[in-house]
Amino acid sequence: MALPGPAVFGPGSRGSLDEAGAEGREAAALAAAGVALEDEEEDDGRRGLLRWDGFSAWLHCVCVVGFDLELGQAVEVIYPQHSKLTDKEKTNICYLSFPDSNSGCLGDTQFCFRFRQSSGRRVSLHCLLDEFDKDLPVYLKKDPAYFYGYVYFRQVRDKTLKRGYFQKSLVLISKLPYIHFFHTVLKQIAPEYFEKNEPYLEAACNDVDRWPAPVPGKTLHLPIMGLVMKVRIPTCHDKPGTTQMVQLTQQADTHTSIILPTVHEVDLFRCFCPVFLHSQMLWELVLLGEPLVVMAPSPSESSETVLALVNCISPLKYFSDFRPYFTIHDSEFKEYTTRTQAPPSVILGVTNPFFAKTLQHWPHIIRIGDLKPAGEIPKQVKVKKLKNLKTLDSKPGVYTSYKPYLNRDEEIIKQLQKGIQQKRPSEAQSVILRRYFLELTQSFIIPLERYVASLMPLQKSISPWKSPPQLRQFLPEEFMKTLEKTGPQLTSGIKGDWIGLYRQFLKSPNFDGWFKTRRKEMTQKLEALHLEALCEEDLLLWIQKHTEVETVDLVLKLKNKLLQAGRESLPVKPDTVEKLRTHIDAIILALPDDLQGILLKTGMT
């Protein structure tokens, strides 16, 4: 199937998406979500699109964004054609796929952006991937409200064009936060695409459609235009801070393989290098969800630095919004730059000088220069007062009046400085810095984990004939009292006002998100234990002492328990589920024939 001639979509565009194709895309999503379709025509459309299920597990669509003299930045191609994007989403993609004009990015540039999914979608694409989400670390789970855009932008002089420059971006739109993986994919396909155009893009998309599903924990072999990428997506069961390396097999095609040591991590030290003296303070700001702006000379620097900041509190998830690259055209521009209220909990990466004035009321601003290649170390920036920041041309520095709660760890600074003097590779420095952040985060979170675990009711309080007991309430003062004996001092030598840091954290979006996640996990555990308790009962003996109405009610409740276990992915052993099914079947068979028939006809078994 050949691609048609490019249709242009963008700000002020005269084109429109093929609505039938868009409806078909939604039909595929509905089908995957288990939502019934209303008529035969839609059902036929769904069956015709099943071939794109493999593609949809990895990508929402691929866009080509070019510069039109009449329309400005415009989406020239969306592939597959049935992919659905709203006008608002297309406008955001248009502006976020090009560097600001002041960046002067000649040649090839790669960066990443993140944008809000338009409201009003009946079924979001993320429903296709939920089955894999449960095994992912929390920081790699998809956010149903956001898309990622991975960009390969080319700008070269071309005298044959009126504008004098060839300017085009190949953009991968995905729900998956696999930054390193998608940048690697773009490195393989974008240069060839700019030479060979649409037929090459179609062939690459067909390759993606044949990929296995993104299952966490498995070594995946992903062919793309003659090469094979070998990757492993982490699982929530991996030990934090360890990387399960993909092994190179002794096969004839080894010379064509690319082995990715990570799917999501950025070069942490390269990003923190200009500010590594203040890395612990930045860790605190990110942990507390403070409003933070990264002002950088190009989208590459801004996006890498924002992603490094978000990554520094791993394995905690950063629950607030973050925008690796943000422009004045963004649909949330007014929301995030208004002075009528306090700046929101968000990390923004910007390159336009206009932001130096627009965001000067924000409490924490990082101004960085060009990130140096590995081996070249920029001069360390200082912490400066916010009033000294007037323009984006201001000197690099961390502009804030924030006073850290913890004393600076001089040991990590000495370690990194020694690495600089010895010309230690950036990758090795990143390992040291990542381990430091991990140990710091774990020292902080372990006391919280220990206290939250104590909120779980005792297993002996779970009765099969009563609703599962509730978790005890989280009481901040009760938690604070536990810190004297089981606080972070057990695992960290860093001194300072840990209590003050905890008090501030308990008010933050990161605590709110973390606690909601833990509470959900513990509630599901209680439901699973309740299910196991039911399975251990002699239910046939129970029904002998109760009426038929009570027995039917029990069957319906047990069926609902089974449905809940599947729907919510409760941590129930397979043999427990099988045991419960056997109980249900035995109870139904003990009922009169007419009741058996009713339960069977209504699909209750």
Swiss-Prot record:
Q: One MF term from GO for this chain?
A: guanyl-nucleotide exchange factor activity
- Could you give one GO CC term from the UniProt record? recycling endosome
Query: What GO terms describe the biological role, i.e. biological process, of this protein?
Result: positive regulation of cell-cell adhesion mediated by cadherin
Provide the primary localization.
other
Q: Which residues form the cDENN domain?
A: 265-390
Physiological role: Guanine nucleotide exchange factor (GEF) for RAB14. Component of an endocytic recycling pathway that is required for the control of ADAM10 transport, shedding of N-cadherin/CDH2 by ADAM9 or ADAM10 and regulation of cell-cell junctions. Required for RAB14 recruitment to recycling endosomes.
List every position bearing Phosphoserine. 124
Organism field: Mus musculus (Mouse)
Indicate what this protein is called per its UniProt record.
Protein DENND6A
